[in-house]
């Protein structure tokens, strides 16, 4: 890295311009979105139905079906803690069992956003008196429980397009086909650059 500057200071994320020496490839400039990261939750009930929320997403100009999800915007909060918070706030649910389903980079050519997708099971309702009051885009959230196989078909047909939905649903289906073997613990390390043969997160 030769130089780095913030060219746009946003409410949630910034746009950064880096000057990087790539050796024989030369010196290049790259602008990208610097993102705090996020988590999402594939919550499955005892009948292997996945919880999806319909929520308006302004950049897409549409309401999208997606799992509970949110930014890593609480300093020092563990990833699983952030996921549990989002599950409670957006879906009024608490999970008794957690695993890591997948790690992915949403747009590695234009953003450093890294996301972790959790699997949550053994679900119970948050008591009414303790429920989060939703407002803004979350105020009119619609909740639907969808059989996992039906969700897979919707992904493959292009009806489910949110990236965490696509990654999470397909990962859950793959894990189910393997008898749920190989799920990672909630404190498994996540590495933004490890490859398939490196034993780290993808």
Please report, for each region that a protein language model flagged, where it lies by residue.
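Short, solvent-exposed loop/turn elements at beta->coil junctions and helix N-caps
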Residues: 3-7, 102-107
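Short, well-ordered beta-strand micro-motif
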Residues: 17-19, 43, 119-121, 145-147
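A short coil-to-beta-strand element that immediately follows conserved catalytic motifs
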Residues: 94-101
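Nudix hydrolase/Nudix homology domain
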Residues: 63, 100, 108-111, 135-202
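Conserved Nudix-box catalytic region and its N-terminal flanking loop in Nudix hydrolases
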Residues: 35, 40-85, 127, 134-137, ...
